């Protein structure tokens, strides 16, 4: 029957290539992480937006740190433009709550179109290392309200994986997810299908 067939397909071993386990956040973990920064401070508001945007858009850390003010287009169809691997440009639609955070944040920045979206106090773009450190710091703080984050290694790429899994859970096909993430090869996107044990269980029910 269909269940037996699906079980057989899932039992087929993957190609003998080096694989990396995909680490992603649950909805509760993502919510706790985004809520961790102290938004009474300028740095806290910056960090909250960075975490939120990383999870909503799935941008690579290099793409996040290279965003400029004019990378954001606010309007009836708000979107973000970024330059990814191979200098390939892609456009990502923005959710309403993301637009609200961006609008508030942009009002705090100098009106310089080519200025960094995520600057330091000195006005220079955040580095990849700085993003990694702030994510680790806020993850530790968020563990106080979400115990499953305790001891969890959350990196910039974890935010990207979280976005991909959210899209997958929403029923988005892997071809569309590949375009969203800027994958040049759809096989790269297939790792999320294999990683999603919850989806496998639902399929077998």
Where are these regions (language model features)?
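Conserved catalytic core of the tyrosine transesterase superfamily
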Residues: 1-205
């Amino acid at each position: 029957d269909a269940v037996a067939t699906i079980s057989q397909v899932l039992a087929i071993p993957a190609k003998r290539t080096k694989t990396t386990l995909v680490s992603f956040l649950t909805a509760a973990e993502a919510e706790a992480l985004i809520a961790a920064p102290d938004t009474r401070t300028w740095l806290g508001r910056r960090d909250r937006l960075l975490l939120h945007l990383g999870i909503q858009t799935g941008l690579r850390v290099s793409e996040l740190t290279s965003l400029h003010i004019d990378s954001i287009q606010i309007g009836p169809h708000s979107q973000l433009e970024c330059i990814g691997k191979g200098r390939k440009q892609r456009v990502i639609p923005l959710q309403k709550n993301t637009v609200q955070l961006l609008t508030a944040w942009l009002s705090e920045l100098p009106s310089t179109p080519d200025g960094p979206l995520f600057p330091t106090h000195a006005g220079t773009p955040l580095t990849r290392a700085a993003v990694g450190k702030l994510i680790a710091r806020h993850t530790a703080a968020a563990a106080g309200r979400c115990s499953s984050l305790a001891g969890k290694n959350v990196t910039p790429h974890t935010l990207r994986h979280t976005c991909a899994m959210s899209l997958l859970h929403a029923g988005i096909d892997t071809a569309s997810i590949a375009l969203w993430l800027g994958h040049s090869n759809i096989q790269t996107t297939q790792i999320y299908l294999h990683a999603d044990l919850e989806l496998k269980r639902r399929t077998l029910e």
